[in-house]
């Protein structure tokens, strides 16, 4: 199998997802990162849509990219307008992008009801736009919007549109499942029909409205597509686009002979995924295949026992292949194998009786509502206590939190903490923005002189668990545990 091109449209299609916006610097940073990993194309945006995208193309031209070609995205000319007079066409040329991706209508429904032109004019719009841009020395890719819906409704016309693009000079025809509603079998049928109709290479662009974007993309490759368009982490409008992280991992690791990315690019997929989540100011998706924090996390005792003996018994690939790592979780569902795996870093005797006592302690705590899966430090403290090796750094005498209103009727939270630190007793009061912040400030005041490194530690997140949902209140000890867990 020849090289499969990866065309990333995170900066254009991905930014159309709800709540997602990339700054100009974000766009340039991601372009550099994608180039480092060996992506073939980076679609930077639509130059006519906003000043930020227009400036991006001016700035990106100065980047010393080694692998990726930067593409500008645009639409066909307007009806009854020559391409050289069309503002969109002129903006694409002004972007100075060497590659231009033009999207055009393939579904006769859109031609009649959205563009409100006849079929002949739509074919002319496609041919004129691609032909004029091609004559200006640009590489042209044609996105056949709604191709699979169009092929289902009117196969002859759908195929005529991509033939018009080929005749005008498109290097590649990209077949789009724009509504994300087609099944893999329909994708295969459409790709095979397109291969019979045109001789230029085909690409695939799938949306995820049926949770099939990755599967449909891989099915298209199997049917002969040589480019996959998508976004990192599947970002995009509605339900998103094909996740290029999963696409790349599957192509590299599951389909023999596929050539993708640069040397060691696949091993950086986890890094790339999390980098994009950070740029988009989004939380990582724990269950994301290949790169999620839970992708290689094992909780059931039988599973952990088997993984400790032979990792591939419960893992389809080595986590390090994609830059991820194996995690052993501890919970009330755990067996002794989980406990043994999680306590190897401690200098304790790993006898059966101690492992059982630790497991019993975990079960008792979780029965009260605590969780240790994302609380590594809390579990470590529990192990040391059960093993008789815990040396407390301080002792809590008592604490109190008051929530009142000030003279302007604004909430005012005050925490009082009394601790025994060595031979001294620290009794302090602090105000904060809510109970957790007030307790954080009070504890810092009490402990900072003994433990100066606390000044380098920040409380970045916390959780409050409602222990008895029918009563609708949070248990105070669970509340405090959530705070101390986040701090450690």
Model-derived features with residue positions:
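Hydrophobic alpha-helical scaffolding
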Residues: 20, 46-50, 78, 119, ...
């Amino acid at each position: 199998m020849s090289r499969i091109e990866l065309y990333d449209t995170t900066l254009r299609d991905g930014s159309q997802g709800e709540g997602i916006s990339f700054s100009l610097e974000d766009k340039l940073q991601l372009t550099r990162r994608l180039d480092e990993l060996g992506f073939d194309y980076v679609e930077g945006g639509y130059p006519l849509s906003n000043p930020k995208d227009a400036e991006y193309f001016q700035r990106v031209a100065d980047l010393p990219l080694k692998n990726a070609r930067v593409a500008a995205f645009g639409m066909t000319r307007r009806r009854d307008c020559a391409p050289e007079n069309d503002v969109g066409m002129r903006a694409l040329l002004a972007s100075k992008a060497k590659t231009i991706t033009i999207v055009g209508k393939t579904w006769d429904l859109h031609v009649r009801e959205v563009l409100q032109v006849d079929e002949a004019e739509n074919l002319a719009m496609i041919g004129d736009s691609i032909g004029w841009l091609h004559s200006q020395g640009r590489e042209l890719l044609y996105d056949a919007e709604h191709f699979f819906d169009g092929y289902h409704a009117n196969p002859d016309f759908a195929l005529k549109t991509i033939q018009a693009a080929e005749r005008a000079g498109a290097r590649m025809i990209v077949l789009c499942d724009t509504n994300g509603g087609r099944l893999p079998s329909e994708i295969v049928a459409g790709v095979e029909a397109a291969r019979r109709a045109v001789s230029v290479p085909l690409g695939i662009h799938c949306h995820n409205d049926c949770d099939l974007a990755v599967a449909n993309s891989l099915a298209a490759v199997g049917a002969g597509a040589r480019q996959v368009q998508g976004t990192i982490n599947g970002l995009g409008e509605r339900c998103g686009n094909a996740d290029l992280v999963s696409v790349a991992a599957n192509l590299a690791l599951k389909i023999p002979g596929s050539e993708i990315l640069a040397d060691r690019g696949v091993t950086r997929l986890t890094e790339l995924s999390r980098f994009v989540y950070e740029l988009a100011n989004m939380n990582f998706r724990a269950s994301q295949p290949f790169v999620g924090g839970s992708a290689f996390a094992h909780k059931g005792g039988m599973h952990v026992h088997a993984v400790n003996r032979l990792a591939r018994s419960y893992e389809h690939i080595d986590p390090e292949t994609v830059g991820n790592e194996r995690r052993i979780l501890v919970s009330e569902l755990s067996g002794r194998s989980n406990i043994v795996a999680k306590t190897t870093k401690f200098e304790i005797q790993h006898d059966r009786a101690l492992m059982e006592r630790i497991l019993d302690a975990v079960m008792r705590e979780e029965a009260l509502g605590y969780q240790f899966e994302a609380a590594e430090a809390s579990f470590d403290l529990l192990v040391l206590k059960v093993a008789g090796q815990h040396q407390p750094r301080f002792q809590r005498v008592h604490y109190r939190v008051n929530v009142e209103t000030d003279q302007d009727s604004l909430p005012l939270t005050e925490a009082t903490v009394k601790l025994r630190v060595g031979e001294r007793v620290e009794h302090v009061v602090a105000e904060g923005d809510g109970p957790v912040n007030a307790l954080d400030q009070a504890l810092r005041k009490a402990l900072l002189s003994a433990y100066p490194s606390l000044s380098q530690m920040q409380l970045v997140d916390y959780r409050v668990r409602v222990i008895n949902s029918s009563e609708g209140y949070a248990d105070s000890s669970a509340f405090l545990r959530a705070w101390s867990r986040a701090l450690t």
